[in-house]
Amino acid sequence: MSKNYDDLSFVTRAIHVGNDADPATGAIEPAVYMANSFLLPYDASQMNWSASEANIYTRNGGVNQGMLEKKIANLEGGEDCVVLASGVAALSALFFTKLKKGDHVIFSTVTYIATYRIFNELWNDKWGIETSIVDCTDLEAIKKAIRPNTKLIHFETPGNPTLCICDIEAIVKLAHEHNILVSADNTFSSPYNTRPIEYGVDFVVESLTKYINGHGDSMGGAVIGSHEDMEKIRYQAQVNIGGCISPFNAWLIQRGCTTFPLRMQVHNDNALAVAEWLERQPCVSFVAYPGLKSHKNHELAKKQMKHGFGGVLSFGLHGEHDLYNRVVTHLNIFTSAVSLGNAASLIVFLGEDDERMYLYPEEFHGGFYRVAIGIEDKNDLIHDLKQAFEAEHLETVD
């Protein structure tokens, strides 16, 4: 008997959707189905080999993948979902399926490095897809960039790493007036804070590696949209190109989902506290975080980010290049590493040689930190930053 989760809260659905007891064993938690093939029926010729619900071969889909897809689609408010090996695999699967030679794509000046390279380098050269890099916080700039062959507008919520905020509803309205599809990478916000489908976005992409898994021990990505489009992505991109998620990674992410809402609220609260403290420090040149009242898109962020502003912030110091590296050596709690959404806080210095730097606001041009705030005690995090600053004789205040 299928269960009805429609009236349940986000927190409850994160625990229960896709976590039904195993009918064969009675186990109340999902097993890991480490099989690459599944038993065929008596007459396999009568099967629909491309059906998503048919367990045939793990590249087509599997038990753990299916359970996770059900949960992610529900949490995002989407009709269906395809889970893949990584966030970049999810992005590539979407673009590969929906775009063709001669199409034009508008993408934001602030995007993840792999997305930037896909659109700015690979797709132009290899596939003949035209692209325009546009400040997607500027609706007039998007309007001017639209061409007769524009097929897709892609942006992030918020943007990585400047934390800019795009007006999702306004972009969707403009795009759909011109029969253009809209995709949003929601990784920095997560479905706990923002569900872009509620604003009319056609496709949402998530790096499940980040907040939704939350433990820094697996990789996965998801595309969420209509059932019709997800079936095309499964068949065209997952089955025929690859990029399928491993059963164990799907299981780890499914497990992470159960505590995801609780962790996400702590990420939100901690990041706001750290951002507010950083903004008061004389040694800090700027702080980019949409939860700050000083952020130019703060009011829009409040409208779109229902429960908080995410766990990532960026900031700069008054000082030269190597000061950033020296400060990091004094940190005890923060780990110098890429990624985000882990229980532990991470920090990375992005120097002046970042290939996207020319697209960022001027305050970023001298280099900056991108900080992924974890779920430690916020006072411990602030104290760790304070002592690291003071070790380099930087002025701080409480």
Label the model's feature ranges.
Residues E53, M219, I253-G256, F309-L313, ...:
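Short amphipathic alpha-helical segments
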Residues M1-S52, V397-D398:
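N-terminal glycine-rich, Lys/His-bearing helix-loop that initiates the first secondary-structure elements
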Residues S37, G225-M230, L317-E320:
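Short loop segments at secondary-structure junctions
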